[in-house]
Amino acid sequence: QEDFLAAVAERFDVAAWGDPGCGEPGADAFWPREKGTFGMFLGGRWYCLRVKPEFQSSDPVKGLDVSILQDQLLGPVLGVGDPRTDKRIDFIGGIRGLKELERRVSEDMEAAFSMYPTSIEELLAVADAGLLMPPKSTWFEPKLRSGLFIHRLG
């Protein structure tokens, strides 16, 4: 765990839950409040991660938090090449909350990460650039029942 935290600290400022600037009074888990910040649950404890400036990007796709997590932590530190196919990764939708992340780590995973949500402005910037959003970078509620919108005419 120490080696992993040291590897993460090469690309992120890392603070343990309860350290100055990491956590809100009365809260027991870290939900990122701004772009470029991540929560990490590891070894029964929450950590706050903030990407170091030299690893930020103005590219509309590379600058997304989901890309930063993949390009700066999951790929280089954990060896996750393709998050869509790597069996070591699972995705938990936003409505299930931080307690679900904690539960999964206590049962069958080693670490969990929470991210600040992708904004509509970021999504539009990617579309305007003619690029594609990375896998699992968006979460919208409510979900359409069939995935299609059907409207009866007449």
Q: What are the language-model segments listed below?
A:
Residues 1-154:
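Surface-exposed, charge/polar-rich loops and edge strands
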